[in-house]
Amino acid sequence: KKYNKDPFHIQHALTVEAVMKWYASELGYGEDAEYWGIVGLLHDIDFELYPEEHCLKAPEMLRKAGVGEDVIHSVVSHGYGITVGCGATIDVAPEHEMEKVLFAADELTGLIWAAALMRPSKSTKDMELKSLKKKYKSKGFAAGCSREVIERGAEQLGWELQKLLTMTLQAMADCEDEIKSEMDAEE
């Protein structure tokens, strides 16, 4: 909250944190789940203060806070290959599986929440993969969520897109109550 105050950005950070912890457990990195979660929580630390320099200001901010270079690399790598508003292209590539999951799931969590908000339940818990895929294919839906980045992320992981969609939807459904209770506590 010190750096991102918009409730949407806070919810996004909490969502990515929870999804990253879920993935850590699912992929056999359970002992590192907290670490994966911290990277997810911090990944957009510079977004509100420096939207035109997203991923470029994060290292300085995180170093000032005493965060290690491993976390900084992971945070910056979620923007790999993306040209930000100031014209710079992020050149720090995701290397570890955790960084590749973050790269792939970041944009996708936004698209899944947007799809959930269109549902009568406003929930991911009752969302079927078929419904998500339909929204995903509609380029005008949640247009700010880059399908290209999501697809590149699946490719980096060596996964079919359907696997990424299925797993991230399941992660969000499993974590939804936790995310909502954290958001309620923020109010």
Language-model-derived ranges and their functions:
Residues 1-50:
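Acidic/His-rich, divalent-metal-binding segments that scaffold phosphate/diphosphate chemistry
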Residues 9-13, 17, 51, 55, ...:
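Generic structural signal for well-ordered, non-membrane alpha-helical segments
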Residues 2-6, 95, 158:
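Active-site oxyanion-binding pockets that recognize sulfate/phosphate
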